[in-house]
């Protein structure tokens, strides 16, 4: 994988445990995160650490191979699916998507017990090597679309 790839999918949910909705394009802002997703809004007095979640298509495929399953990526409940680029395994890195969106990584997106409800063994399959993805906060607003370039800036 390289330092540049593409945005392969966008998903959001309007409430906890809500159904994931995939979209082709979306506005992502510092104030609200992914438009239409319940997790992105900044709460007064809080530092937003989990506005956006990203997962690599290659990591999802590896988890599916380990599990022997074929589950759609959005069942991971991540907002953005990237392909052809390795997401940073550290906090403070900047991911650029499209012309304007910038996301600062805030940590690993550890798989939760909800993954076991989707498929037995899924949590364990997502645990190694940051397969569950990364979390981030928006530092520069932007409208993004499936197919946009994804770059690691720092």
Summary of predicted features, one role per range:
Residues 1-154:
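Metal-cofactor-dependent catalytic cores
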């Amino acid at each position: 994988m390289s330092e540049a790839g593409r945005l392969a999918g966008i998903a959001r949910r309007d409430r906890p445990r809500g159904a994931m909705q995939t979209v082709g394009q979306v506005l992502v802002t510092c104030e609200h995160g992914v438009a239409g997703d319940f997790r992105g809004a900044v709460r007064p007095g809080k530092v937003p650490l989990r506005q956006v979640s990203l997962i690599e298509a290659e990591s999802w495929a590896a988890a599916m191979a380990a599990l022997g399953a074929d589950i759609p990526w959005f069942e991971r409940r991540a907002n953005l699916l990237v392909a052809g680029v390795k997401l940073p395994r550290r906090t403070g890195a900047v991911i650029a998507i499209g012309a304007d969106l910038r996301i600062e990584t805030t940590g690993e997106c550890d798989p939760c017990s909800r993954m076991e409800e989707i498929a037995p063994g899924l949590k364990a399959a997502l645990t190694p090597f940051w397969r569950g993805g990364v979390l981030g906060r928006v530092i520069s607003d932007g409208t993004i679309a499936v197919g946009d370039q994804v770059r690691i800036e720092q």
